[in-house]
């Protein structure tokens, strides 16, 4: 299927690893010009190298900035005033006992997980509406609808993304611009693979065996009973970024392997 993304400019925030990197790779494979973002120049350049190793003709641009700050968002807006596709993928998470999370951590999660998307969307969405063309996608989590007690601050920001995305979609009424949210389930990113390698230190388990045990013990409601691969998320996001998805707007879309036991 030709997704008609050749020549489209896509900004993928937090795209030097995990789901963000996979999305950048998938968009590049479809011919989009992709802006790679991260806080560290060496990681951004390594990502570009990795994508070019698979897609030598990919058109890639560098955007080194900390988008968890207003200054970082300003830098990216200045470097790329107009984009056709904005993937608000940047996000931080870490387990923490609710009673031990100080105000500063709540504000840090809010700045990174929410305000990065707010600041960029505030700039790019108006231009998209004026041009009557564009895609904005927020990468949330199944935690948005199934909050985690050990990550209350993270879960709260993911739920907020659903409301934010729907509010912004309302602004696109009558245009060819869409705003949606994708909610991945547990995904085998680099960080999760590292966790699996250390989760059962006293047992000689392969990564595959550790994955199966983790899913059985910690994600028993998953229908597929395995971790989702970043590429599976990325390919769906790429479709959602394309003109082919024009009838999907204001939606919160789960890619969780059936983890959330709900028909809605």
Language-model features and meaning:
Residues 9, 16-17:
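Conserved glycine-rich cofactor-binding loop
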Residues 146, 237-238, 249-264:
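Short C-terminal tail/terminal secondary-structure segment
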Residues 97-98, 105-110, 218:
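Substrate-binding pocket helix/loop in short-chain dehydrogenase/reductase
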Residues 126, 170-171, 246:
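Alpha-helical segment proximal to the catalytic Tyr-Lys
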Residues 121, 157, 165:
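Active-site helix of classical SDR
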Residues 173, 178, 248-250:
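Short, small/polar-rich loop/turn modules that mediate ligand/substrate recognition or access, typified
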Residues 141:
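Residue(s) in the substrate-gating loop at a strand-loop-helix junction
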């Amino acid at each position: 299927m030709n997704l008609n993304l050749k020549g489209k400019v896509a900004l993928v925030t937090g795209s030097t690893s995990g789901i963000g990197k996979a999305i950048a790779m998938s968009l590049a494979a479809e011919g989009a010009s992709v802006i790679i973002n991260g806080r560290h120049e060496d990681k951004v350049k390594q990502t570009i190298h990795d994508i070019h190793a698979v897609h030598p003709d990919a058109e890639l641009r560098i955007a080194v900035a900390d988008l968890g700050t207003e200054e970082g968002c300003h830098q990216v807006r200045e470097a790329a005033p107009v984009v056709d596709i904005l993937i608000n993928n940047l996000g931080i998470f870490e387990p923490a006992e609710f009673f031990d999370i100080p105000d500063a951590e709540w504000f840090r999660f809010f700045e990174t997980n929410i305000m990065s998307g707010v600041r960029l969307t505030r700039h790019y969405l108006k231009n998209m509406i004026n041009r009557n063309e564009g895609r904005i996608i927020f990468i949330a989590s199944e935690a948005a609808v199934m909050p985690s007690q050990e990550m209350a601050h993270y879960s709260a920001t993911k739920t907020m993304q659903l409301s934010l995305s729907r509010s912004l979609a309302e602004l696109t009424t009558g245009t060819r611009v869409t705003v949606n949210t994708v909610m991945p389930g547990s995904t085998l990113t680099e960080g999760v693979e590292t966790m699996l390698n250390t989760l059962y230190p006293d047992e000689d388990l392969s990564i595959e065996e550790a994955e199966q045990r983790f899913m059985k013990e910690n994600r028993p409601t998953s229908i597929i009973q395995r971790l989702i691969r970043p590429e599976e998320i990325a390919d769906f996001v790429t479709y959602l970024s394309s003109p082919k998805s024009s009838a999907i707007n204001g939606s919160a879309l789960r890619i969780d392997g059936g983890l959330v036991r709900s028909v809605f």
